[in-house]
Amino acid sequence: MTVNELKEQVLEGNFISREEAEWLAAQSDKEALYEAAHEITRTLASEEFDMCSIINAKSGRCPENCKWCAQSSHYKTKADVYDLVDKEECLRHAKYNEEQGVARFSLVTSGRKPSGKNMEKLCEAARHMRRHSSIQLCASLGLLNEEEMLALHDAGITRYHCNLETAPSYFSNLCSTHTQAEKIRTLKAARNAGMDICSGGIIGMGESMEQRIEFAFTLKDMEVQSIPINLLSPIPGTPLERQEPLNEEEILTTIALFRFINPRAFLRFAGGRSQLSTEAVRKALHIGINSAIVGDLLTTIGSKVSEDKTLIEEAGYRFSDSQFDREHLWHPYTSTTDPLPVYKVEQAEGATITLESGQTLIEGMSSWWCAIHGYNNPVLNHAATEQIGKMSHVMFGGLTHEPAIELGKLLLPLVPPSMQKIFYADSGSVAVEVALKMAVQYWYGKGKEKKNNFVTIRSGYHGDTWNAMSVCDPVTGMHSLFGSSLPIRYFAPQPRSRYDGDWDAGDSMELQNIIEQHHEELAALILEPIVQGAGGMWFYHPQYLREAARLCKQYGLLLIFDEIATGFGRTGKLFAWEHAGTEPDIMCIGKALTGGYMTLSAVLTTNEVADAISNHSPGVFMHGPTFMGNPLACAVACASVRLLTSPVYDWQGKVNRISMQLREELAPARQLPQVKDVRILGAIGVIEVTENVDMAWMQRRFVEEGIWVRPFGKLVYLMPPFIIEPEQLTKLTSGLIKIIKEML
């Protein structure tokens, strides 16, 4: 066993044992240990330094007898004693720290726990700070229960801090008025309430190195990702006032061991570090400290933010604009009070994206399925540059332009022959809105105003705008929250006959029953043909589309195909309707239409639908987006469609190669106990697991593996760019399987 071997073991994703950690602690070559810990930090931990500040919102008169603490009423110290500060004082400190670039601000109070009255005041202080500041809020208020944690979380506090302080085997030597088990229950209550947890302790209170290692493993087993490391500052009047301070080598060794044991955690410099030399602080940052509490601390002197920043930047860490992002930019499907981490992209090229840190990730999502040609494509770049020199935008009402005309000419030969009219829109969701409005206005023109409702199938997804949400699954879909407010639609069961399986004739019976009973009020049936995307990544049998088309024709419904995700080759056919050979009355396309460069969608329909709308009052289709037919987007779309359909590009060959490779390389996932299903269609690969994934954990692990994959629910899937190289795709598939194995 060597230090280097244990380092490589950690870098490969395998934890060291307690015995191995004790062996590391005993090594005389400390520099080798420090450098190994440094490499683990640089490879696995965040290079973006995390700073937190605190306000001691209530001081002194604590009934607990913690031997290290100046706040305890059991000891005579010179610690300040004051009651809870008001919310304006809290806000003043929060805003000051926000201006200094500090990411988090923590409310800290002395005592076992606040009174009910003080809890209300603290919650109001948190709400007050959230109203007037965007700094992320933490709290350390003692031993709280889950109900109290929920109140804090509702007030805007997203992280709870409760130090375990030391090893389980040593805690009773330091405190007898509460137990470490009570602290652990507090942390579990915070997690149950939806908060992150922060927990560490104080080293140098008489514990052995073996007990520090025991402590580090306790935190690892609890999966704590923010670990404050305090150095005991013996305070006159406390039982530990004469405790011999640790020497700098022992402190640095402890930090290195904590990094080996908790390789991805934020190791947070907290109290007592002022006793270290500047050189020792620099070395601690080099070894593994990648977070700090700045400013004045609870019972010891802190440090100035500016001084900390200088040392931190000298150590090679960075402060990113992502703090502004966290505080002010609202990302899709993301909490503003407790946002998932975001990774700042500096450049994208081909099938890769490069982060601010310099790390390059293989792109597995095609930027939510639209960047089929990858990034920075010279053909699309040229089209955008050329068009922007002529005209970036002009209204489409009363005017037209060559890019819109040319795009229409390119699209019509690719879609069903009956599609003869094209309506340009802004996005996929808007395209669905347009399609639904077309269907209603069609029947209005036919004198059947009561035909204004819709039928669809469960587990579908059609977008985030109002009517689009109404035809998404109302129970399991992303928009179930709005169910009571949305128009009530009719939902048939999800088809259970797999694309690659046998057709069950009973699969469409419930759809038939609904249409038979309600056809007089139904304007249309809307479906994602063959592939249900964000609703569950399910691939169903083509015969279902044929049966759906038959029912629509028999009972007088329009048939709408939402091809926004499936269009332009993703399923192995240029459009998914081709799998069944059934033509819709209205068809929505988007996403890959511009190769992922710009937002643009289109709704195509038949002359019959367009004529019925146009020949009856009000004589026009009642829709007109501001950016409809945007020339810049149309020009790029023309370039993308030409590129895709050119013989040299050979999109079918590319998609077939990706499909075959996905089938081969994802097949081993079927043997994993946590995997329910593996399914492949065209350039789509899906692994369905048995439990909902931990999004934050899995996203971070994928980034650490050098791949960009964004799972949701129980689905981990790939929709790579068509231009991805085989070795890049192998990195994606192997990374997927590796991380899914870690879910055990």
UniProtKB/Swiss-Prot annotation:
Binding residues for [4Fe-4S] cluster: C62, C66, C69
Binding annotation for pyridoxal 5'-phosphate: G428, S429, D562, P625, T626
Pfam families: Aminotran_3, BATS, Radical_SAM
Alphabetical list of Gene3D superfamilies matching this protein: Aldolase class I (3.20.20.70), Aspartate Aminotransferase, domain 1 (3.90.1150.10), Type I PLP-dependent aspartate aminotransferase-like (Major domain) (3.40.640.10)
Positions where N6-(pyridoxal phosphate)lysine occurs in the chain: K591
Domain Radical SAM core: 44-270
Positions with a binding annotation for (8S)-8-amino-7-oxononanoate: W368, Y461, K591, G624, R710
CDD domains: OAT_like, Radical_SAM
EC number: 2.8.1.6, 2.6.1.62
GO cellular component, one term: cytoplasm
One GO BP: biotin biosynthetic process
Binding site for [2Fe-2S] cluster: S106, C138, C198, R268
Pathway(s) the chain acts in: Cofactor biosynthesis; biotin biosynthesis; biotin from 7,8-diaminononanoate: step 2/2; Cofactor biosynthesis; biotin biosynthesis; 7,8-diaminononanoate from 8-amino-7-oxononanoate (SAM route): step 1/1
Sites marked Participates in the substrate recognition with KAPA and in a stacking interaction with the adenine ring of SAM: Y333
GO terms assigned for molecular function: 2 iron, 2 sulfur cluster binding; 4 iron, 4 sulfur cluster binding; adenosylmethionine-8-amino-7-oxononanoate transaminase activity; biotin synthase activity; iron ion binding; pyridoxal phosphate binding
Cofactor, free-text remark: Binds 1 [4Fe-4S] cluster. The cluster is coordinated with 3 cysteines and an exchangeable S-adenosyl-L-methionine.
Coiled coil regions, renumbered to chain: none
Cofactor list: [4Fe-4S] cluster; [2Fe-2S] cluster; pyridoxal 5'-phosphate
Lineage: superkingdom: Bacteria
Family: In the N-terminal section; belongs to the radical SAM superfamily. Biotin synthase family.
Protein name (database record): Biotin biosynthesis bifunctional protein BioAB
Native source species: Bacteroides helcogenes (strain ATCC 35417 / DSM 20613 / JCM 6297 / CCUG 15421 / P 36-108)
